[in-house]
């Protein structure tokens, strides 16, 4: 361990891999507190679809960066990094171990390494104006929206396919918020870590993972996911960026009478599997992770291996 830097444990892995359970049991062993590294669990009222840890599951372990925003608020890697750094300092100063658990690769990477991320924070009044301008573009088809982006950021338009509507909208939103071009944004990674980091990941065969994902979706639906999405739509959150998350965007067309339920469930499972694949690709290509084989290791075996590395 590097005594000159704060020590943190980071647990990554794809959706449905068991990060929550491992992080809680590890926190019990090493006197830790958990910081969520998930971009969606920050939102209130979005519990089932984000697989948010419940108070019962927490079992007395403090959790941070959960339920801190409303669904119409925005959240970025910049905000996550700023808040997580403050939490790490506070937790460390109280003699406890910060454990960051989550599957949002950019958030984890920005925290561990010296990323320079620009502040996209705007006032509520400015955000309202940005939302109005984005709403005015909703009627445009993908090509028209792409052409609009090209008018002020040709480089981003060149690098983003017209059918990738979400990325096109992201580039437009960035410009409306900052008056800067997304293509010029600086994101510099130094090859030194901010912390003395034990970076762990949970892995398993694709067949096992996909089976766990399909089962989890069924459980979410049994626990009321459809009603959760329905309530968010009724509260006026349908057009919010947070509602583009997997688990929410697939069910909105059912609520609006545009798709049958069974097709939406199939889409939800497929999108979840595709997301898990992207997560694993990110972690394996961009980060140096010590992998724990969930298929061949029990929870206790994983905990024993982790605590051995910490000592």
Swiss-Prot record:
The keyword Transport does not apply. GO terms for molecular function: ATP binding; tRNA dimethylallyltransferase activity. Substrate binds at residues 15-20. This is tRNA dimethylallyltransferase. GO terms for biological process: tRNA modification. It comes from Staphylococcus aureus (strain NCTC 8325 / PS 47). It catalyses: adenosine(37) in tRNA + dimethylallyl diphosphate = N(6)-dimethylallyladenosine(37) in tRNA + diphosphate. Residues 38-41, 166-170 are annotated as: Interaction with substrate tRNA. The record marks 104 as: Interaction with substrate tRNA. Its EC number is 2.5.1.75. The gene is miaA. ATP binds at residues 13-20. Its cofactor is Mg(2+).
């Amino acid at each position: 361990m590097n005594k000159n830097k704060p020590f943190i444990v980071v647990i990554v892995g794809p959706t449905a891999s068991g990060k929550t359970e491992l992080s809680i049991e590890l926190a019990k062993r090493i006197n830790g507190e958990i910081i969520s590294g998930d971009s969606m669990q920050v939102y209130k009222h979005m519990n089932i679809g984000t697989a948010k840890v419940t108070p019962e599951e927490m079992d007395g372990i403090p959790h941070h960066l959960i339920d801190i925003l409303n669904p119409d608020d925005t959240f970025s890697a910049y905000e996550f990094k700023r808040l997580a750094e403050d939490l790490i300092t506070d937790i460390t100063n109280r003699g406890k171990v910060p454990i960051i658990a989550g599957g949002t690769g950019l958030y984890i990477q920005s925290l561990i390494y010296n990323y320079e991320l620009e502040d996209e924070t705007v006032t509520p009044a400015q955000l309202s104006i940005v939302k109005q301008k984005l709403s005015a573009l909703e009627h445009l088809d993908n090509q028209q929206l792409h052409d609009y982006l090209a008018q002020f950021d040709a480089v981003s338009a060149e690098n983003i396919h017209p059918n990738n509507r979400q990325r096109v909208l992201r580039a437009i939103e960035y410009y409306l918020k900052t008056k800067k071009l997304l293509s010029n944004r600086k994101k510099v990674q130094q090859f030194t870590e901010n912390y003395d980091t034990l970076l762990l990941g949970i892995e398993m065969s694709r067949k096992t993972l996909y089976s766990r994902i399909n089962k989890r979706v069924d459980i979410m639906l049994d626990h009321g996911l459809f009603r959760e999405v329905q309530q968010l739509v009724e509260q006026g959150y349908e057009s919010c960026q947070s509602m583009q998350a997997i688990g929410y965007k697939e069910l909105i067309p059912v609520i609006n009478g545009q798709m049958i339920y069974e097709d939406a469930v199939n889409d939800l499972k497929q999108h979840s599997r595709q997301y898990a694949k992207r997560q694993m690709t990110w972690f394996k290509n961009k980060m140096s992770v010590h992998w724990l084989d969930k298929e061949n290791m029990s929870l206790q075996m994983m905990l024993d291996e982790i605590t051995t590395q910490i000592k």
